[in-house]
């Protein structure tokens, strides 16, 4: 999948789930499941409930996403 095929949203982490999964409430009031990106795992960036994050989603499945950035 090319970089142009992703859709970016902002949201808030509402719940931590097993296997490094998170429930994220987007700014448009949709809730999705998301996991952290590989660079965030490699650099051990912790994501906690209540954190503001950027989420990348594919247009083919709008219920799952990848957390790419955590705001301070």
Swiss-Prot record:
Q: Which InterPro entries match?
A: NA-bd_OB-fold, RNA-binding_domain_S1_IF1, S1_domain, TIF_IF1
One short Pfam name that applies is eIF-1a
Q: Which UniProt keywords apply?
A: Cytoplasm, Initiation factor, Protein biosynthesis, RNA-binding, rRNA-binding
Q: Fill in the subunit field for this protein.
A: Component of the 30S ribosomal translation pre-initiation complex which assembles on the 30S ribosome in the order IF-2 and IF-3, IF-1 and N-formylmethionyl-tRNA(fMet); mRNA recruitment can occur at any time during PIC assembly.
Q: Which Gene Ontology cellular component terms are annotated?
A: cytosol
Family membership, please give it: Belongs to the IF-1 family.
Family annotation (CDD domains): S1_IF1 (cd04451)
Q: What is the lineage of its organism?
A: Bacteria, Pseudomonadati, Pseudomonadota, Alphaproteobacteria, Rhodospirillales
The keyword RNA-binding appears for this protein: yes
Transmembrane regions: none
In its keyword annotation, does this UniProt entry include Cell cycle?
no
> What is the protein name stated in its UniProt record?
Translation initiation factor IF-1
**Record's function text:** One of the essential components for the initiation of protein synthesis. Stabilizes the binding of IF-2 and IF-3 on the 30S subunit to which N-formylmethionyl-tRNA(fMet) subsequently binds. Helps modulate mRNA selection, yielding the 30S pre-initiation complex (PIC). Upon addition of the 50S ribosomal subunit IF-1, IF-2 and IF-3 are released leaving the mature 70S translation initiation complex.
What GO MF terms are annotated? Answer: ribosome binding; rRNA binding; translation initiation factor activity
Where does the UniProt annotation locate this protein? Answer: Cytoplasm
What is the species listed in this Swiss-Prot or TrEMBL entry? Paramagnetospirillum magneticum (strain ATCC 700264 / AMB-1)
The S1-like domain, residue ranges: 1-72
């Amino acid at each position: 999948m090319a970089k142009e095929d992703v859709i970016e949203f902002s949201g808030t982490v509402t719940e931590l789930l097993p296997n490094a999964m998170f429930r994220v409430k987007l700014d448009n009031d949709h809730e999705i499941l998301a996991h952290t990106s590989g660079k965030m795992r490699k650099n051990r960036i912790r994501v906690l409930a209540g954190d503001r994050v950027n989420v990348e989603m594919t247009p083919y499945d709008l219920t799952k996403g990848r957390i790419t950035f955590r705001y301070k």
